[in-house]
């Protein structure tokens, strides 16, 4: 506990909150271009080949973004929309690609949770 004299000498500093998605620069989403599309393996208890893309954003950042859903059409030079949101078992992946916008098509034959994967209501 500081004394009054110590508090006069230097005041209490406010706690600075650090953003979890700095590349978005305070925006809800950002547009970017895929520079590389590849798969990586998750952390220890899990096992899979997770689809990710290296994306150069309009803010100038180069980030790794997760491609959600089963199957995708993304390749190099695809223009995508990126939102925040990490993938817990992929270290360094702090962004998601938004399906159903720009060059990323929605997931084929998706019936439930369609809004998260950019799928229109089936007829």
Curated annotation (Swiss-Prot):
Quaternary structure and interacting proteins, as annotated: Part of the 30S ribosomal subunit.
Q: Name one GO cellular component term.
A: small ribosomal subunit
Keyword RNA-binding present in the record's keywords: the answer is yes
UniProt cross-references to Pfam families, sorted A to Z: Ribosom_S12_S23
Designated name of the protein? Small ribosomal subunit protein uS12cz/uS12cy
User: Transmembrane residues, as ranges?
Assistant: none
Chief location category? plastid
The highest taxon in the source lineage is Eukaryota
Q: Which SUPFAM superfamilies match?
A: Nucleic acid-binding proteins
Q: Which residues form the signal peptide?
A: none
GO MF terms here are: rRNA binding; structural constituent of ribosome
What is its subcellular localisation? Plastid, Chloroplast
Q: What is the role of the protein in this entry?
A: With S4 and S5 plays an important role in translational accuracy. Located at the interface of the 30S and 50S subunits.
What species was this sequence derived from? Platanus occidentalis (Sycamore)
What HAMAP family does the database record attribute to this sequence? Ribosomal_uS12_B (MF_00403_B)
- UniProt record, GO biological process: translation
| Entry keywords, A to Z | Chloroplast, Plastid, Ribonucleoprotein, Ribosomal protein, RNA-binding, rRNA-binding
- Which family would the database say this protein is a member of? Belongs to the universal ribosomal protein uS12 family.
């Amino acid at each position: 506990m500081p004394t009054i004299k110590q508090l006069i000498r230097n005041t209490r500093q406010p706690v600075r909150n650090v953003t979890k998605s700095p590349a978005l620069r305070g925006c809800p989403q950002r547009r970017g271009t895929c520079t590389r599309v590849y798969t990586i393996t998750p952390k220890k208890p899990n096992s899979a080949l997770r689809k990710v893309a290296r994306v150069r954003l309009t803010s100038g950042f180069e980030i790794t973004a997760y491609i959600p859903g089963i199957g995708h059409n993304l390749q190099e030079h695809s223009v995508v929309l990126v939102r925040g949101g990490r993938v817990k078992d992929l270290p360094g992946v702090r962004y998601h690609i938004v399906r159903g916008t720009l060059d990323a098509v929605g997931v084929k034959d998706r019936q439930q949770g369609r809004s998260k994967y950019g799928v229109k209501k089936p007829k």
